[in-house]
């Protein structure tokens, strides 16, 4: 009997494959058997396909779209992107399209604003598509990837000198509620560009920004939109907005649609694209909601066990590819729940990405902007993007020495709280002086202050001159001879 069932199934699948759906249209179903959170369960479905898109028509005539998540015999579990409120089990009509989720892409998307599903919300016409691309992207052959080597100058000293970002890198901003991560991201977008070396002509690069917001409030969306408009870059920006009052489930596809648009602009239009994704914590919580609705075995803190893999499908879509002029640099922003860096979201993100920029609440409380704590921050690709002919030959040594002095200064500050200032040595007092001036003069800067890498390095040298030359053990004698004397050589 089982063999007959298998043969019937194979025959049925063959007939479904060779069927001409242009003249013999798809079946529509009114077999909704249950609704659970963002999921709809359908019975008696013939030949459903994994990840197939389903068009859902409600009794009032409004349409929604969903995606097949799971198939069991003749049952299909469909995830509805616009939410399941108002779905009537008897009168809701579902049509299986036989295709995966594709998004229309075009160079005309720049300067436009879309919702989380990729539909225009700026009162403009629909995008005249040059292509329809799978939102999950195409896998990139690791052999074809180009190692990121060109440094992006952000104009922020704490990033440029201590945690340099390379073009094609993925580096998140680890922040928390109430911290100015949006302002930092906006400043990076506003000021970002290649390092302009004295012997290199000024390069006008093909620059574009793709901004995707997931679960943000109206104030955050308005802040970014207004900032892009005020600095004149709106015609180079493509915005995807899923607001806090939009369907939670839509957040699953928003970053994928944004990255599909970014890949088209980078690899087909030869643009250097900066992708800003905020807030990845909202995305992970949407993932947890779907997982809970499917009654999957939960992992840490209720998040699904496959969250690492799922986040990787987003973050790994950054980089450069051989034979293509464009690049994708990713700056995801995530808010750490309860300022906890060991929470699964920042923890797994840190494994996948090439470093992180850590926004610190204590620095913010002391009115230091940008409140970037350089000690837990890291850029894993920094070493290949700095040095002679890329920034300046003393860059790496100055960065190492600043790190060492700041770390020792923090230790001395902790010791001072225990033993008092009178018990400190003269060297300890120098480190304390450096600590205060480093945070005040180096880390702290204005919202619209755009420092070149050379200005930032010179500020670093001014701070290092607090110490006698023999205490600067991480800088070679050649660099000390050139830059340590006051008014040292400037490029």
From Swiss-Prot:
GO terms for molecular function: ATP binding; proton-transporting ATPase activity, rotational mechanism. Gene3D superfamilies: 3.40.50.12240. Keywords: ATP-binding, Hydrogen ion transport, Ion transport, Nucleotide-binding, Transport. PROSITE patterns: ATPASE_ALPHA_BETA. ATP binds at residue 380. It comes from the Eukaryota. One of its GO terms (biological process) is regulation of syncytium formation by plasma membrane fusion. InterPro entries: ATP-synt_VA_C, ATPase_a/bsu_AS, ATPase_F1/V1/A1_a/bsu_N, ATPase_F1/V1/A1_a/bsu_nucl-bd, ATPase_V1-cplx_bsu, P-loop_NTPase, V-ATPase_su_B/beta. The keyword Lipoprotein does not apply. One of its GO terms (cellular component) is proton-transporting V-type ATPase, V1 domain. Belongs to the ATPase alpha/beta chains family. Non-catalytic subunit of the V1 complex of vacuolar(H+)-ATPase (V-ATPase), a multisubunit enzyme composed of a peripheral complex (V1) that hydrolyzes ATP and a membrane integral complex (V0) that translocates protons. V-ATPase is responsible for acidifying and maintaining the pH of intracellular compartments and in some cell types, is targeted to the plasma membrane, where it is responsible for acidifying the extracellular environment. Essential for the proper assembly and activity of V-ATPase. Required maternally for early embryogenesis and zygotically during morphogenesis. V-ATPase is a heteromultimeric enzyme made up of two complexes: the ATP-hydrolytic V1 complex and the proton translocation V0 complex. The V1 complex consists of three catalytic AB heterodimers that form a heterohexamer, three peripheral stalks each consisting of EG heterodimers, one central rotor including subunits D and F, and the regulatory subunits C and H. The proton translocation complex V0 consists of the proton transport subunit a, a ring of proteolipid subunits c9c'', rotary subunit d, subunits e and f, and the accessory subunits vah-19/Ac45 and vah-20/PRR. NCBIfam families: PRK04196.1, V-ATPase_V1_B. HAMAP family: ATP_synth_B_arch (MF_00310). This is Probable V-type proton ATPase subunit B 1. It comes from Caenorhabditis briggsae.
